[in-house]
Amino acid sequence: MAKGQSLQDPFLNALRRERVPVSIYLVNGIKLQGQIESFDQFVILLKNTVSQMVYKHAISTVVPSRPVSHHSSNTSVGASVGNYHSGGVSAPAAQQESDGTE
């Protein structure tokens, strides 16, 4: 489990420390926006006009409003990690591939 947290924790911590506004896309397509107030192994506390506890298992994508630097040996994180999309690519748009007609 520690290996899985080696990218997630520094990334979320950098977003929290720098108070970077984020868009969080849930697996059902809902978009939440705010700043990460805190997080643990299972939840992220997202603050906007109110604080919301968002369970990580419900999150598809976390999109920062600007690039952040975090302590990781891999600097091209956006190109290799499925839970991070740079450039504002939204998860719902990427889900629809075809309508099944030929």
From Swiss-Prot:
Q: Give the lineage.
A: Bacteria, Pseudomonadati, Pseudomonadota, Gammaproteobacteria, Enterobacterales
As recorded in Swiss-Prot or TrEMBL, the protein's gene is named hfq
Annotated GO MF terms? RNA binding
Keywords tagged on the record:
RNA-binding, Stress response
Assembly and partners are described as: Homohexamer.
Q: Which GO terms describe its biological process?
A: regulation of DNA-templated transcription; regulation of RNA stability; regulation of translation, ncRNA-mediated
Q: Which Pfam families match?
A: Hfq
Query: According to the UniProt entry, which residue ranges have a biased composition of type Polar residues?
Result: 93-102
The organism's superkingdom is given as Bacteria
State the species of origin: Photorhabdus laumondii subsp. laumondii (strain DSM 15139 / CIP 105565 / TT01) (Photorhabdus luminescens subsp. laumondii)
- Region named Disordered: 65-102
NCBIfam families tied to this protein = Hfq (TIGR02383), PRK00395.1 (NF001602)
Q: Which family does the record assign?
A: Belongs to the Hfq family.
Q: Would you tell me the Gene Ontology cellular component terms?
A: cytosol
Q: Does the keyword RNA-binding apply?
A: yes
Q: Which residues form the Sm domain?
A: 9-68
Q: Which InterPro entries match?
A: Hfq, LSM_dom_sf, Sm
Tell me what this protein is called. RNA-binding protein Hfq
* Role description: RNA chaperone that binds small regulatory RNA (sRNAs) and mRNAs to facilitate mRNA translational regulation in response to envelope stress, environmental stress and changes in metabolite concentrations. Also binds with high specificity to tRNAs.
